Amino acid sequence: MKFLVLWRIDLALVSGELARAIGRMPEYGQRLEQEGKVLARYHGVGAPGGAWIYDVDSHEEFEQLLGRAPVFNFAEYTVHALADMEPPTG
């Protein structure tokens, strides 16, 4: 199962705690990439946030990984389930 997650930081919440959470995101994302759970990570140019593509075995696993993100409590998320674009068969 693949999910595209667009996340955006609410700049009104900027604090020391948020800055530390943002600082932990690269390590968290790199670990998930090494485990094969995140296929790609992007920063939004001119926007406080990013886009990640998750590749997980279940919806429950996706929710767990998203909930463990250091910025989980500070960000707004838009989640899109993805499907491969295979040509029709038959």
What are these regions (language model features)?
Residues M1-G90:
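Conserved, structured core segments of small domains
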